[in-house]
Amino acid sequence: MPDNFSFVIEGRLAGMARPGRSSPLEEDLAFLMVRGIGAIVSMTERPLDEGMVSGFGLRYLHLPVPDFCAPTIQQIEAFLVFLGDADHAGGVVVHCYAGQGRTGTMLACALVHHGMSADEAIRLVRAKRPPSIDTLVQEQIIFDFAALRENVTSHVQGDRHG
């Protein structure tokens, strides 16, 4: 079994440590397939073997983020587009090296995108995947993304009612 694998949204959205970190990559990819995962988002600086990933029929997105750093708003938006596109292909798993900081940050942003507040999303991710979201900069990007999302939503609603 891969290190630190668990669902945040059962069957739809999961996090884990880098596939192939403590067992052969092929075994970890087979594990994901059995659990209904259809796509992988890799946040490590070094990508996975894309040929092997696609050989298992998995979709793949590489968004490199240095360890202990946070993804950019543009990377979060690219992830959400990929998540929407992958919706019909089964669940999506996000990974960084240990499956904690960068992974937890991106999972929390997905929950914010689906309507949770930043505080709720951080609490849920940390409850389901302790310890997640390692640094203040990772926490801050979740709050920044939530504020941006709220600002865009209020402008769209204002345009409809104005």
Predicted regions and their residues:
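Transmembrane helix boundary and interhelical junction motifs in multipass membrane proteins
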Residues: R102-T105
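Cys-dependent protein tyrosine phosphatase-like superfamily
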Residues: M1-V93, L107-G162
